[in-house]
Amino acid sequence: MAVSTELLVLGVYGALAGLYLLVVPAIVYAYLNARWYVASSFERAFMYFLVTFFFPGLLLLAPFINFRPQPRSLNS
């Protein structure tokens, strides 16, 4: 059972699209969340590049992610 070339090309395109739109932006979100407040200026420029490059995927994942700060406890 040979796989046709068209099906193979379609599978590769689907895998690359999933990687570009879902997998890498999720990794970028995790990286930004971990390093945002402690990054150097060069690292911050790299972060801006990542956001620009993976913007469509970040836009797709944005409604499902909540990075608001947790409420702090006030002990009195």
Swiss-Prot record:
Transmembrane portions of the chain: 8-28, 45-65
UniProt-recorded Gene Ontology molecular function terms: oxidoreductase activity, acting on NAD(P)H, quinone or similar compound as acceptor; quinone binding
UniProt-listed Enzyme Commission number(s): 7.1.1.-
Catalysed reactions, as listed in the record: a plastoquinone + NADH + (n+1) H(+)(in) = a plastoquinol + NAD(+) + n H(+)(out); a plastoquinone + NADPH + (n+1) H(+)(in) = a plastoquinol + NADP(+) + n H(+)(out)
Keywords, in A-Z order: Membrane, NAD, NADP, Plastoquinone, Quinone, Thylakoid, Translocase, Transmembrane, Transmembrane helix, Transport
Root EC class: translocase
Record's bilayer topology term: Multi-pass membrane protein
GO cellular component, one term: plasma membrane-derived thylakoid membrane
Function: NDH-1 shuttles electrons from an unknown electron donor, via FMN and iron-sulfur (Fe-S) centers, to quinones in the respiratory and/or the photosynthetic chain. The immediate electron acceptor for the enzyme in this species is believed to be plastoquinone. Couples the redox reaction to proton translocation, and thus conserves the redox energy in a proton gradient. Cyanobacterial NDH-1 also plays a role in inorganic carbon-concentration.
Subunit details: NDH-1 can be composed of about 15 different subunits; different subcomplexes with different compositions have been identified which probably have different functions.
Similarity section: Belongs to the complex I NdhL subunit family.
Protein name: NAD(P)H-quinone oxidoreductase subunit L
